[in-house]
Design a protein with these regions (language model features):
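Short Gly/Thr/Asp-enriched flexible loops that form oxyanion-binding sites at enzyme active sites
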Residues: 38-53, 137-141, 290
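Short, acidic/small-residue loops that bind anionic groups at enzyme active sites
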Residues: 31-34, 43-73, 81-83, 150-156, ...
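Gly/Ser/Thr-rich loops at beta-strand to alpha-helix junctions
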Residues: 30, 34-43, 64-65, 126-136, ...
Length: 294
């Protein structure tokens, strides 16, 4: 594959990532705008990944239509994505208007100065799902804020957990509460919330004080259509919304998920605690509710 288009794209991604990182370190750029189709957008992501959180980034793309996965365009950065509407082949009455809007947006972003913070507040990263929100909002967040910490929550949907890990690797947090680890179930058994293979390892590897719980680790998140497949007929189900259904894991699947936790946590060289909730792993895992399976 050395001479293939894909190999060339990978080489270009490596080069542009390194070059943009160098330009930013030299204070030669304050933002980034990219225009492209499928390959161009993938290359652009490598450039945007080289810039820190908060630096303006805009991708104008033919595949930003909702029909394609957005992970190729954004990944774990904070880029703004704009649909080009038409394919990109020179300037015409439509592309001119779209490009002008994109230029106006990036210029405006660069000109807006960040608000000056009165003092530096240490941040705690927390993974969260709809099925684990209540204890975070009612108990954990207020208690941490009372102690002077800023609380940053990440939706553990296959992207949010990875975003939290990325920021942990960059030293963004004073501590991490990995409260919603459903992505480990997905990494083993599929569904909508599959994350990177290294999920949950960044804070541990960087010796950031970490507390881990198996919040929602006993469910698999599926599309409503997939949840109705015959292989899931014997599973307990909870229709979370019109697009998403939660199903319970089996005893054997839970053993595999537990082994994944053990493998990752055993790498710890810093301060790590594992808390086991004795009365259920998520909001529907309670006696009398849809996913109760003691």
């Amino acid at each position: 594959d050395a001479g293939s288009r894909g190999a060339a794209v990978e080489k270009m991604r490596d080069c542009i990532h390194a070059y943009v990182k160098k330009l930013f370190a030299e204070k030669k750029i304050q933002g980034l705008i990219a225009v492209g189709g499928a390959e161009g957008s993938v290359i652009a992501r490598a450039a945007m990944d080289a810039l820190p959180l908060g630096v303006p980034k805009i991708a104008v793309s033919t595949i930003a239509s909702g029909k394609h996965l957005f992970s190729d365009l954004i990944g774990y950065n904070d880029a703004t994505v704009m649909h080009s509407v038409i394919d990109i082949l020179g300037i015409n009455s439509i592309s001119r208007r779209v490009f002008n809007n994109a230029v106006g947006a990036i210029v405006g972003m660069v000109k807006v100065k960040p608000e000056a913070s009165e003092k530096k507040i240490e941040s705690i990263g927390i993974s969260m799902l709809g099925t684990t929100t209540k204890p975070i909002m009612s108990v954990i967040k207020p208690e941490l804020e009372k102690r002077g910490y800023e609380v940053l929550t990440f939706h553990a949907n296959g992207t949010g957990g990875d975003c939290m890990d990325t920021l942990a690797a960059e030293g963004y947090f004073a501590g991490v509460l990995d409260f919603s680890t459903n992505e480990l179930a997905a990494n083993n058994f599929g569904g909508l919330h599959v994350a990177k293979a290294g999920r949950m390892e960044a804070a541990i590897e960087n010796k950031i004080p970490t507390v881990v719980t198996p919040g929602a680790a006993n469910i698999i998140v599926l599309s409503r259509e997939e949840a109705l497949l015959p292989k899931y007929d014997d599973r307990q189900k909870y229709f979370h919304n019109p697009n998403i259904t939660l199903i319970n894991t089996t005893r054997e699947e839970l053993k595999t998920i537990a082994a994944t936790f053990a493998e990752k946590l055993n790498k710890a060289k810093g301060k790590v605690k594992f808390l086991y909730p004795a009365k259920g792993f998520c909001s529907q895992d309670k006696e009398g509710l849809a996913l109760w399976n003691p």
